[in-house]
Amino acid sequence: MKIVVSGGGTGGHIYPALAFIHEVKKQHPNVDVLYIGTKKGLESTIVPRENIPFHAIDISGLKRSLSFENVKTIVRFIKSVRACKKLLKQYKPDVVLGTGGYVCGPVVYAAAKLGIPTIIHEQNSIPGLTNTFLSRYANKVAICFEETKQYFPQEKVVLTGNPRASEVVGKDGREARRSLGLDEKKKTVLIVGGSRGARPINEAFLQVLHEVEQKPYQCLYVTGDVHYDKVMKAVNDVGNPSNVIIRPFIHNMPEVLAGVDVIVARAGATTLAEITALGIPSILIPSPYVTNNHQEKNARALEKKGAAIVRLESELTGVRLLDDIDRILLNEQTLTNMKEAAFQLGIRDAAERLYRVMVEMIS
């Protein structure tokens, strides 16, 4: 079996693609995989580290306003489609999967025009430009939120969930807690702003850091590499509570997630897939700097089911954040209800579901 996978720009498109590849390799150890991305995207470093053959194409995204850059982008798209057709004819894949980001546009489009079975995977509740365009040509559209159905041709849609969810299931959080110096008997809240951190979340938590010492729970506070030095200077000025562990970055996040009771985070699709798979209640602060405000839409889907509290960045304060944490962690019934609501939303076999969609298409 040969498959081509394409998706990139951000981890939200790359990690679901990698989780899918891991599942296919588990089912078919001898599968041939080719990953197509860009030289500038994160995929150019992440994918080769996984020992997956990588091919880069020259393509950029469309601007949402009228721009001469868009003319150049369309020209590059046409050239990339030609290059992809040539590559696909040589490689002869059985199926092509696109997981979003502008790079998968010419790849999936070229495959569809060549009659190769194609799937696109949409992680967010509101689709991006690339997947909206590709849904006209792809054979199947895999989604993660029921609400997303309305944006795609109904006969093509299948609810699979985010394959990344499957990679956090079954992890043991005890070793991660021990290695971080966390008390195994205390409830734990993880505060994290994504791989680069989030300044507004850092600022809010620092406002109430001195009050956390009195709390019966503990905090694992992940600042993000770029904010760490500034945060530690502020912490040293007020004193670091004994029940707050501060780290710049967490490399073993699946294991860490398995050991926490509540998470304070952005509302990226991968994060939500992971925390619902594990049934972790959340306080979500959607990033306002994303296309279509999709993080707030993602977060509201969890809030609607009672799995999350949503705080917009504009209304976030330290006092409000600490009150929200207390509201969940200091009330056993609230904690239990939110855990159950989150767990019910989780799709733990997402990678296998997407794999089955692929198998049904090519068999």
UniProtKB/Swiss-Prot annotation:
Annotated signal peptide: none
One protein family per Pfam: Glyco_transf_28
Keywords: Cell cycle, Cell division, Cell membrane, Cell shape, Cell wall biogenesis/degradation, Glycosyltransferase, Membrane, Peptidoglycan synthesis, Transferase
Gene Ontology CC annotation, any one: plasma membrane
UniProt-annotated binding residues for UDP-N-acetyl-alpha-D-glucosamine: T10, G11, G12, N124, S195, I250, Q295
Stored InterPro entries: GlcNAc_MurG, Glyco_trans_28_C, GlycoTrans_28_N
Protein's membrane topology: Peripheral membrane protein
E.C. number: 2.4.1.227
Domain of life assignment: Bacteria
GO molecular function: UDP-N-acetyl-D-glucosamine:N-acetylmuramoyl-L-alanyl-D-glutamyl-meso-2,6-diaminopimelyl-D-alanyl-D-alanine-diphosphoundecaprenol 4-beta-N-acetylglucosaminlytransferase activity; undecaprenyldiphospho-muramoylpentapeptide beta-N-acetylglucosaminyltransferase activity
Main location: membrane
GO terms under biological process: carbohydrate metabolic process; cell division; cell wall organization; lipid glycosylation; peptidoglycan biosynthetic process; regulation of cell shape
Enzyme class per UniProt: transferase
Protein's UniProt keywords contain Iron: no
Catalytic activity: di-trans,octa-cis-undecaprenyl diphospho-N-acetyl-alpha-D-muramoyl-L-alanyl-D-glutamyl-meso-2,6-diaminopimeloyl-D-alanyl-D-alanine + UDP-N-acetyl-alpha-D-glucosamine = di-trans,octa-cis-undecaprenyl diphospho-[N-acetyl-alpha-D-glucosaminyl-(1->4)]-N-acetyl-alpha-D-muramoyl-L-alanyl-D-glutamyl-meso-2,6-diaminopimeloyl-D-alanyl-D-alanine + UDP + H(+)
Family annotation (Gene3D superfamilies): Glycogen Phosphorylase B
Keyword Cell membrane found: yes
Task performed by this protein: Cell wall formation. Catalyzes the transfer of a GlcNAc subunit on undecaprenyl-pyrophosphoryl-MurNAc-pentapeptide (lipid intermediate I) to form undecaprenyl-pyrophosphoryl-MurNAc-(pentapeptide)GlcNAc (lipid intermediate II).
Similarity field: Belongs to the glycosyltransferase 28 family. MurG subfamily.
Name recorded for this polypeptide: UDP-N-acetylglucosamine--N-acetylmuramyl-(pentapeptide) pyrophosphoryl-undecaprenol N-acetylglucosamine transferase
Source organism per UniProt: Anoxybacillus flavithermus (strain DSM 21510 / WK1)
